[in-house]
Amino acid sequence: MASQLSYLQRELLQALLESGVTKEALKKALADGDDYTYPNVPLDDIRNLDEGENCVQLPNGLGESHISEDESSDDGEDFTPPIMKELERLSPEEAAHQKAVVERLLQEDSWHVAKLVKSYLQQHNIPQREVVETTGLNQSHLSQHLNKGTPMKTQKRAALYTWYVGKQREIARLFTFTEFTHAGQGLITDDMSCDEVPTKKMRRNRFKWGPASQQILFQAYERQKNPSKEEREALVEECNRAECLQRGVSPSQAQGLGSNLVTEVRVYNWFANRRKEEAFRHKLAMDTYNGQQNSAPTLSAHDLPHGKTYGFRYIQDSSTDRSAVMANSQSTPSPSALEPSHSLMNSDSKMIPVSGGSLPPVSTLTALHNVDHSQHTLGQTQNLIMASLPSVMTIGTDTALGPAFSNPGSSTLVIGLASQTQSVPVINSVGSSLTTLQSVQFSQQLHPSHQLHPSHQQPIVQQVQSHMAQNPFMATMAQLQSPHAIYSHKPDVAQYASAGFFPQTMVITDTSNLGTLTSLTPSKQVVPLHTTAHGDAPGSQLQNQDSSILHLPLCHRLSPIPTVSSASLVHYHNSSSPENHSHLLSPSHNTIDSFISTQMASSSQ
């Protein structure tokens, strides 16, 4: 027989034997249980239990019992179920039937009954708070009993089962009788007078969305965040139908849902709350993002110690097209992966994933917008920052470069023309080697006559379209320029209108040639520059006795109008005095204009 008992039943049997009950008494109680008849004691006498008077002992344990200190209630006092007073309002037949059902549930496995009660609560969306207020049970104890099967005293289980049976009868009446069709109305019988209404006002049951209705509403929210009145009414019918099917009743009996009946107002409020939550989450995310921007420190070039170079590592894709192009930024849209383009100018933007790796934002490398172009002082060179970036454009080949440096290679240069004076970033890169970045002031005013020759525009546009598709970063850099920005190929490097076009300069070098560059001393030479029209085909070269001077091929002009006939070029020669290495440009020059020519040449270092 012991093998047929569950664990809880064996524990209960062991507790009965330890309480002093003999086996013979248990057998006699089991034999007399079927023939037991309830005494004709008025239900009003139940309140005599509080006065300590003798009463008939019931086999289900509802009578007075002597419990140990460990079995005492959570409040430290004897537990008197308030639900028992509700039996007074029932007719004798209903009260007897309910007691019989409760007695049968007490004889079953408590864990099995607890799962039945929990399933019923979930099916009808009944909160545990309602059970606690009606039965007087402890919220934590009830939750543990329903979820984990924690043992509960017989009196408390009897109170729980009494509420469970009464709630089943109440809900059945709501779905059966048509007079109980108004949502939120309590179950009031004809024989209940106003005097019998309990003096304690019970809190109204709060409406709770069921899982079936929530699934329907979330699917509708994905389609339309602000539905119309007709759409909300259709959702009401769909939700009530799902709630009825969840409870196992016909959808035509939706009014029997009582306080759980879905209405159009509740659907409207649900959608309004979802929109508010979405807006709040968006605002919270933006506040967090802006807070990180304001709290993040910004490193400038002069904050870094001399002699050390800090930069970003970038693994460049070998398949990247390194052909140079010249284009208008308006003709090529920015790729969607890098939109919006102003995110590159954010000092706290995250690494942007591209095909070759993670590309750091431009303005995280140098303070581009804080450079005053009117101050031609040496202090501006301190804004130069070394970093490793991928090549944006190639404007030179190994064969076209001079022997000034020991490690020649393809270099990159971003050149732009602006219709208004502004500072924009200029990137010079040598593959994955060391790169110098500094802002360049584009102050040349473009005239309508200063346009490219029509014969050169068509092949340039075609070359731009093919290159932009393979190099998305360059398209984004084009948006950083003005609408008149132009990117130029090395054989077609423009001869600009004045020697003051670039009031700031750029220096690019390879890591292996950094020591060579810093050990060079400047020497100034005046070289005549022949000014020809745009259609001049022959090219001239700058010749010098020193082999370290680069050859500068004559390039096309932006305008057929001759402008400047001569200017100054500064070339570096090797020197054995590398003491002054604090800046890339020599401190002996108090202006940067002396380093600028009307012709722009780029060399690999």
From Swiss-Prot:
All residue ranges annotated as the HNF-p1 domain in the record: 1-32
PROSITE patterns associated with the record: HNF_P1, HOMEOBOX_1, HOMEOBOX_2, POU_4
Major localization class: nucleus
Keyword vocabulary terms for this entry: Activator, DNA-binding, Homeobox, Nucleus, Transcription, Transcription regulation
Sequence motif: Nuclear localization signal, positions: 200-208
Gene3D superfamilies: Homeodomain-like (1.10.10.60), lambda repressor-like DNA-binding domains (1.10.260.40)
Region annotation (Interaction with DNA) ranges: 128-130, 141-147, 153-156, 206-209, 266-268, 273-276
GO CC terms, sorted: nucleus
Pfam families linked: HNF-1_N (PF04814), HNF-1A_C (PF04813), HNF-1B_C (PF04812)
Region of interest: Disordered: 57-81, 321-343
GO biological process: insulin secretion; liver development; pancreas development; positive regulation of DNA-templated transcription; regulation of transcription by RNA polymerase II
Polar residues biased stretches: 321-335
Region (Not present in other members of the HNF1 family): 448-453
Subcellular location(s) per record: Nucleus
Family note: Belongs to the HNF1 homeobox family.
UniProt lineage: Eukaryota, Metazoa, Chordata, Craniata, Vertebrata
DNA-binding region(s), chain positions: 202-282
Entries under InterPro entries matching the protein: HD, HNF-1, HNF-1_N, HNF-1_POU, HNF1_dimer_N_dom_sf, HNF1a_C, HNF1b_C, HNF_P1
Oligomer status and interactors: Binds DNA as dimer. Forms a homodimer or heterodimer with HNF1-alpha-B. Potentially also form a heterodimer with HNF1-beta.
Name listed for the protein in its UniProt record: Hepatocyte nuclear factor 1-alpha-A
Keyword Thylakoid on entry: no
Region of interest (Dimerization), ranges: 1-31
MF annotations from Gene Ontology: DNA-binding transcription factor activity, RNA polymerase II-specific; RNA polymerase II cis-regulatory region sequence-specific DNA binding
Domain POU-specific atypical: from-to ranges: 85-180
